[in-house]
Amino acid sequence: GRLGMKVDTKGDFTMTGNYEIRRGEYTFTFQNIINKRFQIQPNSRITWTGDPYGALLDVTAAYRQYTSLSPLLPASSTSADQSRRYPVDLVIKLNGDLGSPAISYDLDVKEYPASSDFRQAVTAFKSRIQSNDQELTRQVSSVLIFNQLLPEGTNLFDQNQVNSGVA
């Protein structure tokens, strides 16, 4: 993008313009234990209207994790496709002021079998995480920490979940 930078005779510095990000990477680190590489999505941008520290963010990044969708399926479901891993994107969006952006998350199940069991389970999952912030946070945390989705009603740190996530 085009950026304008000015320094006046008093030493005041201003920036104006848009910086469009076509590609890039952001490494999410938690307690030096969890490191996940997020890919910055095309058309993300940073806009300056004067104050260099007052930039406005409109940035989207995604981390892809291949995981089983079986936690989303009914317990009675028996399909050979259950054990397969499917791409799930953990999406983070930063919007607003550079110093204190609004941060939002989403999970996007990219590909899955066309069977009615999978279609219904994924649709119900998407509806649940869109209408329940606590459920979205629980699922995002599970993907970040354990690289897997959780069945509905399961505690994030249930001992069986910890054991299977670490294995």
Which functions belong to the PLM regions below?
Residues 1-152:
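Strand-loop-strand
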Residues 161-167:
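Short, intrinsically disordered, charge-balanced linker/junction segments flanking boundaries
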